[in-house]
């Protein structure tokens, strides 16, 4: 049996941004559900953080969630099992009040949500579904983890040693990987960066949400219960783009022939590496703005930038997060204190990046 795994969808992200809603809608309309139809996949497991806001959901986002995700599930006669993540819960110490219970707990759809650890069978294969672990369910969750006969675990977990973002710090909180060593396969949501360490797989979010996601591959996975393998299906759509401008290496013809349509409704950083001909730059910016990007930031940088390794270019020439981390590194405090300060800075920075102002 093949199961589509998706996680950290964060409907209503970027403060219920319509641009973000339109962007993620393309993923479901063009990539996710067409793939499921083509491969005749009739089971989805969502590994948590279906919605973004913990405290409330506005009417527009609720409708977008239904029209974009729930409705195609129902119309495609697909079964969906939704694991509750920390963004889905109203309180931090209990999962009892959560988005899926309040929105779809009384619906007639073939949709189930899991706010407690549960073992389900999929075509003869037992899988432990493990929602966000908090103080009220910790003991029960750990008991099931220790005693279950299931060899596969899907959850929304915070596990030490994994990175939430590609440019972030390794998590030092939460459970140790050894807690899950008895399972053959562990798949988790929560951290948006895809990574694997031994038997544990963080699946990552299906699309970009902040500048930290730039050039970090996004998509969803298909799990084969018979072979116990994961297949990654890439999402080609990007919300964040960078243009490195160097008119010593590009001509006016290059600028005029460039396809700017990919920048519509997106965030764009124009990094000026070398500017010798202002007219060429003006034409590039004119064409860029005509494509109706959502936001454009121009960074005047005179450092040597290796265009062959664009992923090494920071958010800015030296972005805010890098500057703050370097400052903390030079403070006369212990390494542990530096880690805690950097972790808090990372958290605040990514919260700010996810806001739509």
Predicted feature residues:
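Alpha-helix termination/capping residues and helix-transition junctions
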Residues: 38, 147, 180, 262-264
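His/Asp/Glu-rich metal-coordinating catalytic cores
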Residues: 43, 50, 55-200
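A structural signal for the main folded, soluble domain(s) of proteins
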Residues: 1-2, 29, 35-37, 136, ...
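N-terminal active-site segment of His-dependent metallophosphoesterases
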Residues: 1-64, 141, 145-149, 342, ...
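A conserved active-site cap/scaffold subdomain adjacent to cofactor or substrate pockets
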Residues: 189-239, 243-246
């Amino acid at each position: 049996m093949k199961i589509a795994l998706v996680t950290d969808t964060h409907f209503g992200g970027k403060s219920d941004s319509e641009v973000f809603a339109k962007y993620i809608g393309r993923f479901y309309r063009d990539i996710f559900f067409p793939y499921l139809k083509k491969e005749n996949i009739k089971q989805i497991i969502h590994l948590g953080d279906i919605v973004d806001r913990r405290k409330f959901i506005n009417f527009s986002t609720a409708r977008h969630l239904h029209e974009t995700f729930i409705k195609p599930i129902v119309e495609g006669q697909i079964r969906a099992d939704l694991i509750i993540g920390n963004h889905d819960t109203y309180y931090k110490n209990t999962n009892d009040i959560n988005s899926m219970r309040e929105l779809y707990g009384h619906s007639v759809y073939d949709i189930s949500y899991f706010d407690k650890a549960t073992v389900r069978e999929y075509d003869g294969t037992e899988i432990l579904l493990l929602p966000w672990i908090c103080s009220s369910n910790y003991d029960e969750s750990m008991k099931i983890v220790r005693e279950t006969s299931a060899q596969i675990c899907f959850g929304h977990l915070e596990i030490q040693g994994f990175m939430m973002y590609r440019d972030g710090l390794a998590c030092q909180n939460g459970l140790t990987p050894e807690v899950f060593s008895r399972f053959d396969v562990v798949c988790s949501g929560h951290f948006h960066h895809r990574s694997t360490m031994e038997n544990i797989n963080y699946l990552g979010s299906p699309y970009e949400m902040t500048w930290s996601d730039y050039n970090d591959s996004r998509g969803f996975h298909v799990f084969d219960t018979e072979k116990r393998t994961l297949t990654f299906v890439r999402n080609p759509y990007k919300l964040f783009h960078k243009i490195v401008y160097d008119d010593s290496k590009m001509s006016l013809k290059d600028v005029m022939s460039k396809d700017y349509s990919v920048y519509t409704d997106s965030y764009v950083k124009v990094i000026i590496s070398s500017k010798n001909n202002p007219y060429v730059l003006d034409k590039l910016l004119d064409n860029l703005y005509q494509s109706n990007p959502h936001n454009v930031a121009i960074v005047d940088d005179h450092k040597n930038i290796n265009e062959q390794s664009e992923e090494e270019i920071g958010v800015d020439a030296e972005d805010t997060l890098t500057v703050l981390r370097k400052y903390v590194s030079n403070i006369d405090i212990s390494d542990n204190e530096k880690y805690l300060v950097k972790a808090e800075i990372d958290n605040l920075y990514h919260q700010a990046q996810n806001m739509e102002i």
